[in-house]
A protein has these predicted regions:
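Conserved N-terminal phosphate-binding loop of PLP-dependent enzymes in the Aspartate aminotransferase
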Residues: 1-117
Length: 117
């Protein structure tokens, strides 16, 4: 019984993770000046943030602001990477597509707001 549940959680992580990355890549296409790369496997995902579309300029300030704003909206993220410009997403294994949509919506809303500045 426990093994079966574990297998379902692993399957869920793969299915939802693939969906989540696909949705995040749609956001990346809309905001290439902010997002250089989406990477990860399963539900362990990273979003590399940059300054003005320049791959050699990591955007630590934007990453920190994004995690702090999203924390106020109930989304817990962290930063990683040598420049702390990578948004690290590590949700629980029970994370589902609705949760992914919510996180994507919050990230997109944040970037829309930043883009207006």
């Amino acid at each position: 019984m426990v093994l079966k549940k574990k297998e379902n959680l692993q399957k869920n992580a793969k299915i939802v993770g693939d969906y989540f990355v696909k949705q995040l890549r749609k956001i990346q296409i809309k905001f290439p000046n902010y997002i250089s790369k989406i990477s990860g496997k399963g539900l362990f995902i990273g979003i590399d943030l940059i300054i003005n579309g320049n791959l050699s300029l990591p955007n630590q300030k934007l990453a920190t602001k994004l995690i702090n704003i999203l924390r106020l909206r109930g989304v817990l993220l962290s930063t990683d990477g040598p420049f702390n410009n990578v948004i690290k997403i590590k949700p629980p294994l029970v994370f589902n597509k609705d949760n992914a949509d919510f996180v994507c919506s919050e990230i997109e809303s944040f970037l829309i707001h930043e883009n207006k500045k």
